[in-house]
Amino acid sequence: MQGNTCHRMSYHPGRGCPRGRGGHGARPSAPAFRPQNLRLLHPQQPPAQYQYEPPSAPSSSYSNSQAPSFMPPRPDFVPYPPPAAPSAQGPLPPCPVRPPYPNHQMRHPFPVPPCFPPMPPPMPCPNNPPASGAPPGQGTFPFMVPPPSMPHPPPPPVMPQQVNYQYPPGYSHSFPPPGFNSYQNNSSSFPPSANSSSTPHFRHLPPYSLPKAQNERRSPERLKHYDDHRHRDHSHGRGERHRSLERRERGRSPERRRPESRYRSDYDRGRTPPPRHRSYERSRERDRERHRHREARRSPSLERSYKKEYKRSGRSYALPVAPEPAGCTPELPGEMIKTTESWAPPPENVNHRSPSREKKRARWEEEKDRWSDSQGSGKEKNYTSIKEKEAEEVPPEKTEEEEEELLKPVWIRCTHSESYYSSDPMDQVGDSTVVGTSRLRDLYDKFEEELGNRQEKAKAARPPWEPPKTKLDEDLESSSESECETDDDSTCSSSSDSEVFDVIAEIKRKKAHPDRLHDELWYNDPGQMNDGPLCKCSAKARRTGIRHSIYPGEEAIKPCRPMTNNAGRLFHYRITVSPPTNFLTDRPTVIEYDDHEYIFEGFSMFAHAPLTNIPLCKVIRFNIDYTIHFIEEMMPENFCVKGLELFSLFLFRDILELYDWNLKGPLFEDSPPCCPRFHFMPRFVRFLPDGGKEVLSMHQILLYLLRCSKALVPEEEIANMLQWEELEWQKYAEECKGMIVTNPGTKPSSVRIDQLDREQFNPEVITFPIIVHFGIRPAQLSYAGDPQYQKLWKSYVKLRHLLANSPKVKQTDKQKLAQREEALQKIRQKNTMRREVTVELSSQGFWKTGIRSDVCQHAMMLPVLTHHIRYHQCLMHLDKLIGYTFQDRCLLQLAMTHPSHHLNFGMNPDHARNSLSNCGIRQPKYGDRKVHHMHMRKKGINTLINIMSRLGQDDPTPSRINHNERLEFLGDAVVEFLTSVHLYYLFPSLEEGGLATYRTAIVQNQHLAMLAKKLELDRFMLYAHGPDLCRESDLRHAMANCFEALIGAVYLEGSLEEAKQLFGRLLFNDPDLREVWLNYPLHPLQLQEPNTDRQLIETSPVLQKLTEFEEAIGVIFTHVRLLARAFTLRTVGFNHLTLGHNQRMEFLGDSIMQLVATEYLFIHFPDHHEGHLTLLRSSLVNNRTQAKVAEELGMQEYAITNDKTKRPVALRTKTLADLLESFIAALYIDKDLEYVHTFMNVCFFPRLKEFILNQDWNDPKSQLQQCCLTLRTEGKEPDIPLYKTLQTVGPSHARTYTVAVYFKGERIGCGKGPSIQQAEMGAAMDALEKYNFPQMAHQKRFIERKYRQELKEMRWEREHQEREPEEAEDIKK
């Protein structure tokens, strides 16, 4: 086998490191990491040294006389295992330790080499005598094979040469024992084959295997079945690949042996452990049996739990689709859609139908009606999430273990280089480990000529077509000429795009393209969506912004050397998606090579920089939350960069037509040649024993694509194919099912085959077979984008909501609702409006590609991943501008994410949808469509009640709301707090009004937008590429919000000090002013007595009384005069004890309470949006709650007034609230913010549960208006409650107001209060109690059902508290 190649791949210094590089250039050293199998050597023991030698020549003991049933091996065949070379022959020079590169830099090795277990000694055998003079355990190391999990044996013997071991930084990579030799000639290591007991057969396996788990061991019955199956006559291919049992027994002759294959014995072929994936062997005799016996011989796999049983469609043309229930609006992949798992849409829009097809259609209709009747009672089942179904099938512990197994790094090796690559150190260029040979260069030229330039040649052969220009094109041209220099208020081409942009004209223009493949197949044009241009921004706006694929801090990358693997400058990552739903298909792309099947499992990504400190990429597609993992692994070496680029252009440009996916960046398109930021390699693998993988070399993939590039139905064979038996034709059609075929020059060029039909419409004319493709019409062209349907749908939803909240529903209203529902159903059933379409194409001109839909499914995840990685790399540039490095990178991304942003495809969304519909899997499994708005929806009274009824989490919980409004809510409180504190200390003589004026000037959005511009946040913000933020005023407002979110993120992860430093640096550019702002003086009372002023208590009766309050609350103030000033009312004049009253402290205390309450709500209420959090905070930090807490603490008894009589005075609610806020400020000044947190944890936050259960977060006036709006009549202005003042009595300083509230001309409530506002609140509360509002009753029932036990406990506590004073009075009596 390829021992020498893999030997060099694995252990050349500078090439055997985790990414397969290590040579030139300044590169940070790998972090210190110590594998678990290292063992400390004795201090006096010298470090072990190892010497690896290439495999020895075949032993003469291997002779043809001993194996008469086998052909003699070819000269380059290496037996397993080879004996040690005799000293007379002279061993080959050992593998060089250091490549002969100039200025080659080695990575730092570990202090001691790893202790690997030595190879067990070979068993005695007459054909394999032990080599004399060879130390035990010494041998070659041709492959990267992990060591068995065994106890550590004694250390290996000392060898004359030392090797530097290098380990990947991210995970432990296991290596084989130094003495492991995969080519030892030990014929007795394995039992003889069943075919010839006297013939020794050899397996390329480790000399000892890992112990298997109990549940993985094959039972005797299964082993017997496995052996029986091995001797059956199952072919592995068609045509010349068909091999009978007789041929398998006699082996392959040397002259018929393929030069690129490696000779393997029948024992080896038959007993190779089955792969972890499905083994898709093709058979011409037993079509159904092959799947059955594959299931029996397949080994346990972690992907099996996610796979569904493969259901054949038989000979039927198509299966009926489920009818769409009313109100269901399916959309394209990544949007809301509703499909079934195994039903396909019926063919429609067919011009010519044969009689047999009409009979089939009648059967389809019957099955459709029968299926719809059976499903009528279970509409909601279709909305069940795929993740929930899988959670029921698979236990949670098992799912977690399987996902860990999926993400666990594996040891890999490449298939043979076959003279396409050279790994000779003398041939290397720069820091490569593999260089392409002239044979590989010829292969690249052939691939580029036959496949790479095929599309361009076909387009050039067609006559050019100039599309007619629309008014939008003229506006864009005029906008680019003027550069928008005169338009300061807008960054869009027009202020009213809806008036200028004619969507219908744009769609007609795309439909009129002469090269269009079919009317119902939509294609991609650069910079265009299905209904017009992707970007309608001005030329000035296109020069910046993430939405234009311009990532700050990106620089052009020097091109890689095309004919080498550039191992020293590329970093390799394996890409995998979890969960694997919709990515593991029943028809994967399989490449047969050397009697093995290599199954497509995803892509490898090569980056030019290490992907450190980049979080996982999460995206919603098919209504399922996916996570894209990029796992660092050992680099597969047999590839060259030019081969990767040829494949990428073939797949992404010619097949998928992703024209708007730019991996270089628009800024570098016209610059000198530069390299793409990422290279991609398809991974075709087969599983090896002990959990390893063999990756197919890149040249074999290109050869496979060249072999597959043949006509789908050759013109010269049409007549022959039409004469095939039905079974033979059905098998060919099944093989083509799911295949991607291409018609060069058409739009779109490639499509997936769902059915292949050879029925002839005209018996006199032979026609090509028909390709049937089941596609999805774009949303803009189906009922989902129809303005009439949208208008009718909105009116239907509004009427349904009104009837649900109406106390009495009229029969006419019910009929009106039913009529609208029926009208919606009719629109959905129109052929021109259906989402599912059936496309029929002639197979003439179509070519096979060898690619199936699973490759396209994985490929469409790559734009999302590359956008995610590039964005997080540019955020590192933002870290430098901020002066703070975030540890939680997702938190920084969240701060930059505007609510309008949605990460769907990472590029032009219509391009991705079209490519998925044309080339993706036919019927993806969809999750619950609610996943899109489950945590994002915040409109509607029902959503408000649902969210506001949720109690807080006991432990801090991360939020699932993926935009920055919540962080903006927190950052706003932080900015207000910092501003208030600094102004309070810097201006000790300024009154509350002046402080509030200065604070308003600092925290207003216009000023915060200026600070955001200093950080260039507009270049980093993520927001929708549309008209939302086109106007400069809207963009400035969004930038101010983004700045507040950034301050909140810094405060949340860093500290208050970090947020203070950042805010100070941005406020003042002058270092002196910044120093004044940041280093403010102490409070005047603290400056008078720097240490403490408690010595004044003895001489001051006022302070003596305050010590009682200190004992009551358990806090001893260092400067007790601060507490005295907090309790000094405004009516008290200036005195030397307090130096003023408490109005300034009230200003500071309000900001402190806002910050502490905001942080608590942000952490413990993760499902609440900004508006919901504001409602909760308003219920906590208001005069009523504050006055209640102050009264419970008895603060009114310690209030310092100018009343000489010292009589107890009943303070107003506002005065009590001011006392509490002033106390909070004094507590912060004397202690710190931690004391305030503790105080509010005890006195305020426990009240939240009562506020939520009683719905006290909603004031009576707002609640009454909400209830009245639910009773509005359709087509009329909604009736709202009106308040009228009926009476005003009392003097001017103590008046009482009487207010009544009217609804629809009827008085429904009345209230009294010391102010008009309080009287209106009383009137609204009275109306809610007396008037029978259905919405109010619904809210009460909702809370009662949800928190029945909590409400009982709360009522019991309230009754207990009310009885306590009465019991105390009875005891006194």
UniProtKB/Swiss-Prot annotation:
List of residues binding Mg(2+) 1: E968, N1041, E1044
Cofactor detail note: Each RNase III domain binds at least one Mg(2+) or Mn(2+) ion.
Domain DRBM: start-end pairs: 1259-1333
Gene Ontology BP annotations: defense response to Gram-negative bacterium; defense response to Gram-positive bacterium; miRNA metabolic process; positive regulation of gene expression; pre-miRNA processing; primary miRNA processing; regulation of gene expression; regulation of inflammatory response
Reaction(s) catalysed by this chain's protein: Endonucleolytic cleavage to 5'-phosphomonoester
Pro residues bias: start-end ranges: 70-99, 119-133, 144-159
Residue ranges, compositional bias (Basic and acidic residues): 214-271, 278-288, 297-312, 363-398, 447-459
Family: Belongs to the ribonuclease III family.
Protein's recorded name: Ribonuclease 3
Organism encoding this protein: Mus musculus (Mouse)
Phylogenetic classification of the source organism: Eukaryota, Metazoa, Chordata, Craniata, Vertebrata
